[in-house]
Amino acid sequence: MILLLLACSGTGATDSKGGTSPTLSSVQSEVFNASCAFSTCHAAPGASGLVLEDGSAWSALVTVESADNPGAILVIPGDANGSYLVQKLRGDAGIVGDEMPAGNPLDAERIQLVVDWIDAGAADD
């Protein structure tokens, strides 16, 4: 599902520490498009109904309950550790099914990109 580098310069807003906060655009291009939004995975109609294509990911993730794990919210703005998406990407204990992306887990840098975006508020840019 998720791969590649951290956000390139100019792809995020300045955070309170003077660093760059990832944007949905950077997460979309570096994670979702690169590792998730394929015809066999999360392109329309999407595995488990989850579509992570351009223009669909934010509304499919933010404050949305998991279809596979009722009660688990996919993305909780400001709370990456509590977000089921991050738990699935990390392969945390208690997830339903497999770590994502199946068979090709993301590297730590790409997971951190998603974590940073969520912790920064998971804005739709």
Regions found by a protein language model. Give the residues of each.
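Sec-dependent signal peptide hydrophobic core
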Residues: M1-L3, C36
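Solvent-exposed helix-loop boundary motif
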Residues: G10-S21, S25-Q112
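Flexible coil segments in periplasmic/lumen-exposed cytochrome c-class electron-transfer proteins
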Residues: A108, Q112, A120-D125
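C-terminal motif of bacterial Sec signal peptides marking the signal peptidase cleavage site
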Residues: L5-A7
